[in-house]
């Protein structure tokens, strides 16, 4: 059953179509890959689905809800969260502080919380969750370090950790291993497989085909703002239409 359903999604910038009639489904409990040549519309699709930019046409349904055009924070509360290729955290805050900041339903410093004594309890709960998340992602040893001190791979892990702190049903990852050394890339892949086995669904944009082959089934290929084809990685890689799209030849997208 599809957890995410996208139908007829379209978005243009200054008259240039970035996505044009995009249809895609992401089944619950999968790691689905989203690949395609540069300019295929992958990041625009992420931006529209996650509410960063409104669609010109089309619909997005998640977990049975119509989330088309909703604000990003509303979509996150519904259980769908995305990460970015370039980390968007708070570089001067520590790793644990970054994680706590993204915790679901974090209370403010309101008078009611102070009177009832609940603010501190919630802060302690968030801290415990942040520690558990950092430990899981092998970030606890740098938990008190500023996020700006992390390596590129550690920043990718922190992006995943922040997403986990929102209690997501599904995470959209934008190039989670770009610029990461092979050892840490493998570790990130291990984390994603483990999280999938625990019930979290993923949609991943990635240009490293080894990672796509290892992690993703199915794989969706985009070209010219639409879905070109979908299937197992081995079949996708052998498809001459996909090969032509990557080599810059004009692919026929029905």
Language-model segments: what does each one mean?
Residues 2-254:
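Glycine-rich phosphate-binding loops of nucleotide-dependent enzymes
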């Amino acid at each position: 059953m599809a957890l995410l359903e996208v139908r007829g999604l379209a978005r243009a910038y200054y008259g240039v179509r970035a996505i044009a009639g995009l249809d895609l489904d992401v089944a619950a409990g999968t790691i689905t890959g989203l690949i395609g040549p540069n300019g295929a519309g992958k990041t625009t699709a992420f931006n529209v689905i996650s509410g960063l930019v409104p669609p010109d046409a089309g619909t997005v349904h998640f977990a049975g809800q119509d989330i088309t055009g909703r604000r990003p924070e509303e979509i996150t509360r519904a259980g769908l969260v995305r990460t970015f290729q370039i980390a968007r955290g708070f570089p001067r805050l520590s790793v644990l502080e970054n994680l706590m900041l993204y915790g679901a339903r974090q209370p403010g410093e309101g008078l009611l919380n102070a009177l009832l004594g609940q603010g501190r309890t919630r802060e302690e709960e968030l801290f415990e969750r942040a520690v558990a998340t950092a430990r899981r992602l092998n970030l606890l040893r740098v938990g008190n370090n500023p996020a700006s001190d992390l390596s590129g791979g550690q920043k990718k892990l922190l992006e995943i950790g922040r997403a986990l702190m929102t209690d997501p049903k599904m995470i959209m990852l934008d190039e989670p291993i770009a610029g990461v050394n092979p050892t840490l890339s493998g570790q990130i892949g291990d984390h994603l497989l483990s999280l999938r086995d625990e019930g979290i669904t993923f949609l991943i944009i990635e240009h490293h085909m080894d990672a796509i082959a290892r992690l993703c089934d199915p794989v969706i290929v985009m070209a010219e703002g639409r879905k070109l084809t979908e299937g197992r990685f081995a079949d996708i890689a052998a498809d001459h239409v996909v090969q032509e799209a990557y080599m810059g030849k004009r692919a026929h997208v029905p």
